[in-house]
């Protein structure tokens, strides 16, 4: 049965150019500032040409603003620019689950989110994405639960371990899971 025959509420799929503009705006709302490559990888992992993706970005036009992040051109929604510019860097520590959108959105190959040297620690065999420790907006380690402990593998180059922030996150996780958990840092 064809979808339009199955439901009177069926809406025809949009043309690719129209759908792309909607997707770019939604993507940048969630993950901006982001590069064309970030969006391209998130959308299709190379199934659409880079040239086509660039055309789609150009078609969004004045709704986007270019910004520089670490010497690279990124895009943000024009309406979000002032808020972005007034945002202060965070020192927050978070334990995020495997396959979290924090790394899937920009992609594990974005060095602003995940240091390149640690990509294999997060993006593992058979497509597994490990649970991550984010501190100061950057992936600083991985974690897992073993017995009654949250075992954190803190990246040595990430500096001092933020133990109080990690303890607070383990406490939060304990509440969510309904069981007491300890903290072990490697």
Question: Which role does the model predict for each range below?
Answer:
Residues 1-103, 108-186:
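Long, low-complexity intrinsically disordered regions
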């Amino acid at each position: 049965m064809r979808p339009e025959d199955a439901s009177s509420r069926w809406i025809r799929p949009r043309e690719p150019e129209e759908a792309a503009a909607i997707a770019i705006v939604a993507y940048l709302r969630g993950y901006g500032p982001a590069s064309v490559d970030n969006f391209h990888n998130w959308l299709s992992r190379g199934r659409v040409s880079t040239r086509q993706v660039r055309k789609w970005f150009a078609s969004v036009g004045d709704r986007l603003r270019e910004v520089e992040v670490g010497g690279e051109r990124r895009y943000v929604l024009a309406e979000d620019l002032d808020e972005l510019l007034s945002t202060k860097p965070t020192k927050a520590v978070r334990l995020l689950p495997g396959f979290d959108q924090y790394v899937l959105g920009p992609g594990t190959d974005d060095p602003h989110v995940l240091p390149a040297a640690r990509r294999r620690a997060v993006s593992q065999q058979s497509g597994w994405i490990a649970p991550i420790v984010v501190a100061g907006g950057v992936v600083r380690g991985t974690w897992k639960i073993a017995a009654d402990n949250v075992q954190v593998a803190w990246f040595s180059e990430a500096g001092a371990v933020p133990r109080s922030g990690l303890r607070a996150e383990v406490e939060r996780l304990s509440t969510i899971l309904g069981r007491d958990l300890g903290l072990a840092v490697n």
